Amino acid sequence: MTTIRKNHPLFKAANSALIDLPAPASLSSLWNFGSLLGLCLISQIATGLFLAMHYAPETSSAFASVAHICRDVNYGWLIRNMHANGASFFFVCIYIHIGRGLYYGSYLYKETWNIGVVLLLLVMMTAFVGYVLPWGQMSFWGATVITNLLSAVPYIGESLVQWLWGGFAVDNATLTRFFAFHFLLPFVILALTLIHLIFLHETGSNNPLGLPSNSDKIPFHPYYTIKDIFGFLVLLFALISLALFAPNLLGDPDNFTPANSMVTPAHIKPEWYFLFAYAILRSIPNKLGGVIALLCSILVLLVVPILHTSKHRSLTFRPITQFLFWLLIADVLVLTWIGGMPVEAPYIITGQIASALYFSLFLILMPMASWLENKMLTW
């Protein structure tokens, strides 16, 4: 059996990635979230495939087809609830995964980190086009508002928006192409995930101390396979509990009303996991400026490895930067809250301060804290 595992062309690749992989002995549960993201992706593809079998990507029947799935298809309600809430769990895992990377200096594996940022952008795009598919009020108006942001692009903006819409407004052509994108992109994400792993296995995993762990490695199986399976069980238990007991907790009530281009909802807002970026977008009182800020809120992650000046990799031994990291987490939570609030005082100024702090932490305060900590090492 060992010979097949180590010599077979297919099995040996899986063996070197999942069984005989040398892993640091001190990985905490924060290192579980990569495998949990893999589980979320597989779960979303599986449930999405079954939903696609019954969904009708056509404006006159999309909303009714989702109702049909929930009422008439065997366990359709469960599949739909698992898929909708699975997206929320996906983003919980992805944000914790990124937070762990920032805290422990995993971004110094630059190729792995950069592919991770591309994956984040693709997952966000997939979730956005997926939110449009039920064709409720918030689906329609969310699509209208966000796609309209492209009109801020100088010179070609208007043409770009009409090209994306397939007409002069969000309509049937838009829904059809968004369904095509939503079906295709998870498989692109799957392929990029494999590349993400290939680059990770070139260097090996980082560890909580941020120190080289070549002298202290253990085989991935059984130690971390058991740990990952435990993580899977916890995640699935939480997801199934949410899907069964409070399936609409994270959704928007407006989306239970079929899309109507003649009636605008009082407050147009995206799903909770985009609210921090939406708050940053709204904090700039200029359309193009807001779009640039929105993009930079994600792309700022690409400059984190460049701005790393500390002699330590991890924040484990860096109390000042540790404080700034938790300030960043609090700031993102404040932005998430502001994104769900109406555009009025005091939310406007609070959002602007939180947005300024968000970029300051990444671009100014954390690099300065690293420089100060380096100085303190020589005192």
Curated annotation (Swiss-Prot):
Gene3D superfamilies: Cytochrome Bc1 Complex, Chain C. One of its GO terms (cellular component) is respiratory chain complex III. Its cofactor is heme b. Keywords: Electron transport, Heme, Iron, Membrane, Metal-binding, Mitochondrion, Mitochondrion inner membrane, Respiratory chain, Transmembrane, Transmembrane helix, Transport, Ubiquinone. Binds 2 heme b groups non-covalently. Heme b b562 binds at H83, H182. The chain crosses the membrane at residues 33-53, 77-98, 113-133, 178-198, 226-246, 288-308, 320-340, 347-367. Heme b b566 binds at H97, H196. A ubiquinone binds at H201. CDD domains: cytochrome_b_C, Cytochrome_b_N. It is a multi-pass membrane protein. It comes from the Eukaryota. GO terms for biological process: mitochondrial electron transport, ubiquinol to cytochrome c. PANTHER family: CYTOCHROME B. Component of the ubiquinol-cytochrome c reductase complex (complex III or cytochrome b-c1 complex) that is part of the mitochondrial respiratory chain. The b-c1 complex mediates electron transfer from ubiquinol to cytochrome c. Contributes to the generation of a proton gradient across the mitochondrial membrane that is then used for ATP synthesis. Heme 1 (or BL or b562) is low-potential and absorbs at about 562 nm, and heme 2 (or BH or b566) is high-potential and absorbs at about 566 nm. This is Cytochrome b. It comes from Crenimugil crenilabis.
